[in-house]
């Protein structure tokens, strides 16, 4: 039996809708599709592993059904969470972030179940001592990744210790029972597997509670003294994520200071945490623990509304997936960015921007009439038009050809020089790093190296071939 995957489900190609009824229809259709897929998978698991315990997969599936029913019943009241007021439309991106999170939680339990029982089905002879050592190693690894912060409520940290102590005691009792009763090897194997599943569930359930708490805004801390030299400062920053079943540390103990007016590049392999780092310093997300101070403001204390206001006042963001409003023309999309700048004198001339990115002759076109590279150019112009204090970009030149990449990068550097803007971008292109005042190398959620460049190159000085 093959593994389950979210990609087996079909999603709409559209990204936005202005019709609340359409939002409900899309939600209902997708959740029904997911339910049928998961129900079929659960039946197949029962058929293939009828003698195995299906407690966790079945329980998680039932939780999903209950959540689905509640979600659809309450959608008329809760649909505002998917509504972008500024653009007057519902976002399918926001909708499917929520729906997929629920479906993935069930899929994770199905796949974990498959992993466990495929291992059990291996032909090698079961050895109790080896299995117990593997069990200890597994739980040791779980404990190393436990979420922690000094801010955590005492009852959650104490619960972790209680679970560890109870598990050790119960394992000793189980091994004594096996030594006394000497059951067959296959029963010993089942007893240990059941023990692992049960205690893993308890441990991760508490971890999910901890991470959920950590990802909420903190109580307001003491006022931060602005650092005139460094516009961004991170101290011991962690970011944990959860799908409702398991947890993962994406950033691990990040310490970082970024100077104002610098051009900064973040490099790292896929899954290294570089986009998460960008999201946290740009106010797109909060850290789970530690301190993130941007322009003198402590980000971990901000609620969602305050983060939105922070981005509106100080940040321009160039999204990897463009993020253009589909019912607005090229020019109108750029004007949206410009209008976020409350001081009209600070706005950058839209005609000059469109000319610079080669889109002035297409300014009356809608996004669906443009290529991917053209949409990215509009996204870049929109971020620049506001003339924000900080500009962040997630692969901002990823969809551009070589010639336009160079044109856009020249525009980046010109705006930085003229307006003293601080710019931070994530990229896979090592050549772009030669333009940076500072290069941050990220791997496995940690900063592996910082490379300051006292004499950054100009675009025309780089061999782009």
UniProtKB/Swiss-Prot annotation:
UniProt xrefs under InterPro entries: AAA+_ATPase, ABC_transporter-like_ATP-bd, ABC_transporter-like_CS, MacB-like_ATP-bd, P-loop_NTPase
PROSITE patterns: ABC_TRANSPORTER_1, ABC_TRANSPORTER_2
Positions contributing to ATP binding: 268-275
Domain ABC transporter intervals: 232-465
Lineage: superkingdom: Bacteria
Pfam annotation, one family: ABC_tran
Keywords: ATP-binding, Nucleotide-binding, Transport
Any one GO MF annotation of this record: ATP hydrolysis activity
Family the entry assigns: Belongs to the ABC transporter superfamily.
UniProt protein name: Putative ABC transporter ATP-binding protein MG065 homolog
Classification lineage: Bacteria, Bacillati, Mycoplasmatota, Mycoplasmoidales, Mycoplasmoidaceae
